[in-house]
Swiss-Prot record:
GO terms for biological process: amino acid biosynthetic process; aromatic amino acid family biosynthetic process; chorismate biosynthetic process. This is 3-dehydroquinate synthase. Pathway: Metabolic intermediate biosynthesis; chorismate biosynthesis; chorismate from D-erythrose 4-phosphate and phosphoenolpyruvate: step 2/7. Zn(2+) binds at residues 180, 242, 258. Belongs to the sugar phosphate cyclases superfamily. Dehydroquinate synthase family. It holds the Pfam family DHQ_synthase. Disulfide bonds: none annotated. GO terms for cellular component: cytoplasm. It comes from Chlamydia abortus (strain DSM 27085 / S26/3) (Chlamydophila abortus). The gene is aroB. The lineage of its organism: Bacteria, Pseudomonadati, Chlamydiota, Chlamydiia, Chlamydiales.
C-alpha cells in the first residue's frame, strides 16, 4: 500500500511496506544512492534495507553517525561531508535519511549544502519524526550547545512514512512523539485532543488508528507550513512549548529527550499564557495536564530530575540560568526580549498582530520558573 497523503509543501506518502520497488521509481540508478542514518538505526534495520536497494541495481553508499542530540554537531557534519567527498559522490546523486528527528535534521542540512544541493528523500522511523520532523524542510545542527543554530530550509522530494518501523522502538519512545501531537491540538486543531482522548489506548494496538493519527497530525503541520514555508509568521506557532524546551535541552547538555522537554515546555508556556491574560480559561491548563499524564509525559521540571546528570542539577534548576538560555532562542530580536508562542484557547495560538509570538513580562516568566525550580529543590 502506498497512499499519497500530502502534495504541498512537498510530497508525503503513507507506506504499508517499505520494501516496494515502486517507491524508488523516481530515483535514477545512474548515480550512487547515499543512505544516512545513526548507528542505532543502522544496527537495527539497515542491513535488509541496503540489500533490498542493491537488488534494484543501485550503488548504495551507507553512512552513519553516533546517535543522539549530543552528536548533532558541526564536527559530525564536517565528518559526513568529508565522507561524501571520499566516496566521490557526484552531483545528481540522491540522499535518503532514515531515522528520527536528529537524523532528519542532519541529512537535510547535509543534502542542502553538498554540491549546493542534491535530491533528498526522508524515511522517518520515530513517532516524533513521522508527525513533525519530516514535514516542512527545516534542518540544522547545534553549535556551541545551541539548538539548530546552523541550518537551512530544504524541502525533500518525497517523504515515506512507514508505521511498521515504530515496532522496532520501545513504547516509551512512541510516547515522546505524542507531545508533538498534543502541541498540534493546543495551537491549531483541538480535535487532536479529542482523538487522543477517544482512541489513545488503541494507538499501540490498532494499525488503522495509528495510521489515522499520523495522517491527522501530518495534515495539521503541512497546512501551517504551506501558508508560511520560511517561518516568517504563522509557522512560528509550531514553536509552542519549544522555547522552554530548547532552553532546558541546552542546560541538560543533550541528556533530555526532545519530546519530554516539549511536554514540560508546553505546560510552562501555558501557565505563562494564563498569567499574561492571553488565555482566559484556567481549565485548559488542567486539561493539558491530564492529557499529558495519560501518556506518561512529564509536566514539571521536577519530573525530569532523574534524566539530568546529578552534577548538572544545580545549574539546571536555576531560573536565572534558564532565562539566560532562553536569551539565545532564534525567535528573539534581542536577549532581553524573549519571544514565545502563547496559547489563547484549545486549538488556537494567539496571533499577536500577525507575528504569532510575543514577549511575556519578565516578572511573570521569572516567577513561574522560580516556582518550578523551587518545587524541585524542596523535594
Amino acid at each position: 500500500m502506498i497512499e499519497n497523503l500530502i502534495s504541498h509543501p512537498h510530497h508525503i506518502k503513507l507506506v504499508g511496506d517499505f520494501f516496494n520497488k515502486k517507491l524508488f521509481s523516481s530515483i535514477s540508478t545512474d548515480h550512487p544512492l547515499v543512505i544516512l542514518t545513526d548507528v542505532q538505526v543502522a544496527k537495527e534495520i539497515l542491513p535488509p534495507i541496503v540489500d533490498f536497494i542493491h537488488s534494484l541495481d543501485y550503488t548504495v553508499v551507507p553512512l552513519s553517525f553516533p546517535s543522539g542530540e549530543k552528536n548533532k554537531t558541526w564536527e559530525t557534519f564536517i565528518s559526513l561531508q568529508n565522507q561524501l567527498i571520499d566516496h566521490d559522490i557526484p552531483l545528481g546523486s540522491t540522499m535518503i535519511g532514515i531515522g528520527g528527528g536528529v537524523v532528519l535534521d542532519m541529512v537535510g542540512f547535509l543534502a542542502s549544502t553538498y554540491c549546493r544541493g542534491i535530491p533528498l528523500f526522508l524515511v522517518p522511523t520515530t513517532m516524533t519524526a513521522m508527525i513533525d520532523a519530516c514535514i516542512g524542510g527545516k534542518n540544522g545542527i547545534n553549535l556551541r550547545g545551541l539548538k539548530n543554530r546552523l541550518g537551512t530550509f530544504y524541502l525533500p522530494q518525497d517523504v515515506w512514512i512507514c508505521p511498521e518501523f515504530l515496532s522496532t522502538l520501545p513504547k516509551k519512545e512512541w510516547l515522546y512523539g505524542i507531545s508533538e501531537a498534543i502541541k498540534h491540538g493546543c495551537i491549531a486543531d483541538a480535535s487532536i485532543w479529542e482523538f487522543l482522548h477517544n482512541y489513545g489506548d488503541m494507538l499501540f494496538s490498532s494499525r488503522e488508528i495509528l495510521s489515522e493519527f499520523i495522517k491527522r497530525n501530518c495534515l495539521v503541520k503541512a497546512a501551517i507550513v504551506a501558508k508560511d514555508p520560511h517561518d516568517q509568521h504563522l509557522r512560528k506557532i509550531l514553536n509552542f512549548g519549544h522555547t522552554i524546551a530548547h532552553a532546558i535541552e541546552t542546560l541538560s547538555q543533550g541528556c533530555l529527550p526532545h519530546g519530554l522537554a516539549v511536554s514540560v515546555g508546553m505546560m510552562i508556556e501555558t501557565k505563562i499564557s494564563l498569567e499574561s491574560g492571553i488565555m482566559k480559561n484556567p481549565a485548559l491548563l488542567e486539561q493539558l495536564h491530564h492529557l499529558s499524564k495519560r501518556f506518561h509525559l512529564p509536566t514539571t521540571l521536577e519530573e525530569l530530575r532523574d534524566l539530568i546528570p546529578q552534577h548538572l542539577h544545580h545549574e539546571f534548576y536555576d531560573p536565572e540560568n534558564i532565562i539566560h538560555a532562553l536569551g539565545y532562542d532564534k525567535k528573539n530580536l534581542s536577549k532581553k526580549a524573549i519571544r514565545m508562542v502563547m496559547m489563547e484557547d484549545a486549538g488556537k495560538a494567539t496571533s499577536c498582530n500577525g507575528i504569532y509570538c510575543t514577549v511575556p513580562k519578565m516578572a511573570i516568566l521569572y516567577e513561574i520558573l522560580k516556582s518550578e525550580c523551587y518545587a524541585m529543590c524542596n523535594n
